[in-house]
Amino acid sequence: MPAGRKSPQSSVKPLDYEQGCWADYNAKDVFLMGKLSYILGRALRMDYGELFRTVGVVHGITGRNRPAVLADIVSCGLRYGAGFNDYLLCEFYNLTPEQRATYVTRSVNNTLVQMLNDPEYYKYFDYKSAFYSTFAEFIGREWLDFPAISKEQFAEFVKDKDAIIVKPNNGTGGKGVEKLTIADYKSIDMLFSKLKEDNIGVVEEVLKQHPGLNELNPYSVNTLRIVTIRNETGGHILYAHLRIGNGGRPVDNLHSGGMFAPIDLDTGRIQYPAYDKDRKTYEKHPMSGVTIQGMQIPLWEQAKELCLKASEVVPQMRYVGWDVAVTPERPVLVEGNNLPGYDILQMPPHTPDKIG
């Protein structure tokens, strides 16, 4: 759908929310809608090796015997729709049944996506070239649909650039995203051929991030994950996090070693220390030494406004996680996710009351 074209009206009936929030939906009620299919599906696709590794990790942390840990993990799957990763990352082993019931688990999140997002419109989010075209007014950088261009067009694009960012068209979790220095290649022809061999989807200019975020970690563009939900009254922001790169990689994704910290929606300040998928807490960034908690997100109000406007473009997608880069001039979209991550919403260092 080209930028500027009016989206077709949704055939999906809006849900009745109050305050534009999912709080009206009891997590247990939502889960029960897809309980049987979830259990059967997970049983068939379960990585049992990883399950038993998780049992061992929890055994080491708690001292509980392995059969008891396994039984509790299975019970949490049946009662709350929690996967074994939910159990470990959210530390279900430290929660009461009442606390566990408040958490958005994998099954609950998947059911919300099924209720709120029309699969016919996933294509505008799953493929980067389609996303960039659909949300062109929010992209804020030069880019090329690489499979559709000639070598001459590519040469014209890179002639005044020292480096470029290349991405697969449908990659997730930062996989396949690279920052390439033009001078590292003997010729433009050689670089063009390499990108063709690698099945690159989009080529784009390197974003310059706001100095406030660059000071925190200059090796990657540290993005905001802002999750929106839409109902008949419009768009609403559910929650937001800052994602921070680590280890010198050009991406900040959690699956690529990054960390995350929750943002206060009213003030734009980081509420707690950062946390990563290895369950490590960071008061300061390990490479820059900058204190994370209390940091002010630059251009915060503009970032929120950007995501609310973007949520209007494809109204059939009512539950979206937006990745936003903040440049010195303005926030811009990096991508949109039709299956927003739910786990970062409720990690132990960020939920001192143990309520999800």
Across the structure, where does each feature detected by a protein language model lie?
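ATP-dependent carboxylate/phosphate-activation module, predominantly the ATP-grasp catalytic core
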Residues: 217, 221-305
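Acidic carboxylate-rich catalytic motifs and surrounding loops in phosphoryl-/glycosyl-chemistry enzymes
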Residues: 145-149, 242, 320-323
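Short, flexible loop/turn elements at secondary-structure junctions
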Residues: 170, 184, 205-207, 228-230, ...
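Conserved N-proximal alpha/beta basic substrate-recognition cap immediately N-terminal to
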Residues: 35-156
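Intrinsically disordered, low-structural-confidence terminal and linker regions
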Residues: 1-46
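Active-site nucleotide/adenylate-binding loops and adjacent lid/helix of ATP-dependent enzymes
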Residues: 111-224, 232
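Protein kinase-like catalytic core scaffold
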Residues: 164, 236-238, 332-334
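C-terminal active-site "lid" helix and adjoining low-complexity regulatory extension at the edge
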Residues: 22-24, 28-30, 49, 283-308, ...
